[in-house]
């Protein structure tokens, strides 16, 4: 069997990126089929309608391209392996990134296994803006060509074996090119806006949604000087560096500068705020990360120079990484960084190559 005759199952979301991915693979000679994943049991009419519309769009694209669309329900896997951990992290006062966990447990585990075992796939494909390259017998994860859309931050948990079984057709393109292809093909997804919100759950009102599963616990908002200036409705609704939604204005003691969350005292249910986006309490000189995943699956020892992102769309930060033990590292930034948030991921790069990353366990504050 030639390489181009191999079977690829494309994860069809009902969006433009997966739609164009399917067409690109057809042009490359692959045998292409689609798979629509249902990963959440809708509990309200609006959400049901959104999921139904996405499935209808995915079906319309597959019909247009002349490919078969399969469907599968991964709701149980999503609940057990993604959502329960997501809730536990919020309950502990941390700010998790469910999209990263969703990619790890659903798109590149449950989907990959289902496609290979049940559908006979040689590869899976997704509409992620990343690239792969084979170096020294291992598949590497590279940033997407479109730096504005690069999604390697969300895929750092993939192993080189998973990357070797995955294709990322739009990773070699820029977003406007993808939309142009969809328009030229007359695909219904050509002008569909990009999805946002929690992975697979959609654009819900986050506060209301989280409140269904975790009871809110109101508490004090205090300044770094210890003055009580307001009440929060639950620490889980707030993250370090947050400015909007605090419900506090200027105070007699403060200036007119906006307030930012600089700390969360989980034990006492207190939200700590300060004025100014570069307040010293908001700055970190480094971090400790755990739950490490390296793409090449080689254990990291010693030290290395590289760059790091502590959140999506952040400019790369030059840093020095030092191994503390098998599953913990210390990262020291060249310059202090604002709003390093426990629970989020620190993802490391060597140029275009994504090396891997880990969960931020703690930030190393600026010495005072």
Curated annotation (Swiss-Prot):
One of its GO terms (molecular function) is tRNA binding. GO terms for biological process: tRNA wobble position uridine thiolation. It comes from the Bacteria. Disulfide bonds join 102-199. The record marks 128, 344 as: Interaction with tRNA. One of its GO terms (cellular component) is cytoplasm. ATP binds at residues 11-18, 37, 127. The active site is at 102 (nucleophile), 199 (cysteine persulfide intermediate). It is found in: Cytoplasm. Keywords: ATP-binding, Cytoplasm, Disulfide bond, Nucleotide-binding, RNA-binding, Transferase, tRNA processing, tRNA-binding. Belongs to the MnmA/TRMU family. Catalyzes the 2-thiolation of uridine at the wobble position (U34) of tRNA(Lys), tRNA(Glu) and tRNA(Gln), leading to the formation of s(2)U34, the first step of tRNA-mnm(5)s(2)U34 synthesis. Sulfur is provided by IscS, via a sulfur-relay system. Binds ATP and its substrate tRNAs. Interacts with TusE. This is tRNA-specific 2-thiouridylase MnmA. It comes from Shigella boydii serotype 18 (strain CDC 3083-94 / BS512). The lineage of its organism: Bacteria, Pseudomonadati, Pseudomonadota, Gammaproteobacteria, Enterobacterales.
């Amino acid at each position: 069997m030639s390489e181009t005759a191999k079977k690829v199952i494309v994860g069809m979301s009902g969006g433009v990126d997966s739609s164009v991915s399917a067409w690109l693979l057809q042009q490359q000679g692959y045998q292409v089929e689609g798979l629509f994943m249902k990963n959440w049991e809708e509990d309200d009419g609006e959400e049901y309608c959104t999921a139904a519309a996405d499935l209808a769009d995915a079906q319309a694209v597959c019909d247009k391209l002349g490919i078969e669309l399969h469907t599968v329900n991964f709701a149980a896997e999503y609940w057990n392996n993604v959502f329960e951990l997501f809730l536990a992290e919020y309950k502990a006062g941390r700010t998790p990134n469910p999209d990263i966990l969703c990619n790890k447990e659903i798109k590149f585990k449950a989907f990959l296994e289902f496609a290979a075992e049940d559908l006979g796939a040689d590869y899976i494909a997704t509409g992620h803006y990343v690239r792969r390259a084979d170096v020294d017998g291992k598949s590497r994860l590279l940033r997407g060509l479109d730096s504005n859309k690069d999604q390697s931050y969300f895929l750092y948990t993939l192993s080189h074996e998973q990357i070797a079984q995955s294709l990322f057709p739009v990773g070699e393109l820029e977003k406007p090119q993808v939309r142009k292809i969809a328009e030229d093909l007359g695909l219904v997804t050509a002008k569909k806006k990009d999805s946002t919100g929690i992975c697979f759950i959609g654009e819900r009102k986050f506060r209301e949604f989280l409140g269904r599963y975790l009871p809110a616990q109101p508490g004090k908002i205090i300044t770094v000087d210890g003055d009580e200036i307001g009440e929060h409705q639950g620490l889980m609704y707030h993250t370090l560096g947050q400015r909007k939604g605090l419900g506090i204005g200027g105070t007699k003691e403060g200036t007119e500068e906006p307030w930012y969350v600089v700390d969360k005292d989980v034990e006492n249910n207190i939200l700590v705020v300060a004025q100014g986006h570069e307040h010293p309490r908001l700055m970190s000189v480094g971090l400790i990360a755990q739950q490490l995943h390296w793409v090449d699956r080689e254990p990291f020892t010693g030290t290395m120079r590289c760059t790091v992102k502590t959140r999506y769309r952040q400019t790369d930060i030059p840093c020095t990484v030092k191994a503390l033990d098998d599953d913990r590292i210390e990262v020291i930034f060249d310059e202090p960084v604002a709003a390093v948030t426990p629970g989020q991921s620190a993802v490391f790069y060597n140029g275009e190559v994504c090396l891997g990353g880990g969960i931020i366990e703690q930030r190393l504050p600026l010495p005072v």
